[in-house]
Curated annotation (Swiss-Prot):
Keywords: Membrane, Signal, Transmembrane, Transmembrane helix. This is Putative uncharacterized protein FLJ37218. It is a single-pass type I membrane protein. PANTHER family: BUBLIN COILED-COIL PROTEIN (PTHR34344:SF1), UPF0184 PROTEIN C9ORF16 (PTHR34344). It is found in: Membrane. It comes from Homo sapiens (Human).
Length: 231
């Protein structure tokens, strides 16, 4: 393990082509339980997302209005883990249909960076429900990134189970999205998702690019390295 851990500490691995795409249906329940309610000020796209206080008018109509935001949508923080250049931000509207509106935001910066621009998404958004998890191109990009880091990647990532996807969703919300490596490390220790799901989550996030103590990275790979094939 000593031969590749130092490389992780010194090397900034480009992750812009690796995207992790769990089904929308696995994300919404987790987000609803962990993220505070937010709203977007209309008119000025440069303004940051703010937390909406209890009972505050969010500018999208009364409760039940199809334009209204989810009570607890995903907080926009730039490049969200696993979203890449795809649409990010708000996951739906309040009501029985849970449809995603046209005014969701799209991140146009590379995967893993901390800054971004925002613009309205005019194209239709994918419907909720099971989705293809990885395209051939994404699998190839993920395999290349793993090989660059010294691992022999699996030939396909389509073998992930629904439980593994749910594990990744939970880990993203609890650790990576908050940018706290200690929280992520504790979550990994408790939930113990499969090594392949854990590694893919980490590569698809900005976790390894953010400042992290060496002890965190060592413990992190202690959890997943025993079951990983090496090239």
């Amino acid at each position: 393990m000593a031969k590749w851990v130092p490389a992780l500490l010194l090397r900034r691995v480009p992750l812009f082509s690796l995207r992790f795409r769990p089904a929308s249906s696995t994300f919404l329940p987790v987000l609803a339980a962990t993220e505070p309610a937010v709203s977007v000020p209309s008119g000025d796209l440069s303004m940051p997302v703010k937390t909406r206080a209890e009972g505050e008018d969010d500018g999208f109509g009364e409760a039940g209005d199809p334009r209204r935001l989810l009570e607890r949508p995903w907080r926009f923080r730039g490049c969200l883990p696993g979203k890449g250049n795809r649409d990010v931000g708000f996951e739906g509207t309040e009501g029985p249909t849970s449809t995603r509106p046209e005014w969701v935001w799209s991140c146009r910066c590379c995967l893993g960076c901390r800054a971004s621009t925002r613009e309205r998404v005019t194209s239709p958004v994918r419907a909720a429900g099971p989705q293809p998890r990885f395209t051939d191109r994404e699998t190839e990009a993920a395999a290349g990134t793993l090989a660059h880091m010294g691992f022999a990647p699996p030939t396909s990532f389509s073998h992930f189970t629904d439980q593994e996807l749910r594990d990744c969703s939970s880990l993203e919300c609890l650790g990576v999205v908050e940018g706290d490596p200690h929280v992520l490390c504790s979550t990994l220790s408790l939930s113990r998702p499969s090594p392949s799901a854990t590694l893919t989550l980490l590569l698809a996030s900005s976790c390894l690019l953010a400042p992290a103590p060496p002890s965190f990275i060592l413990l992190l790979f202690t959890l997943i390295a025993p079951d990983l094939p090496h090239s």
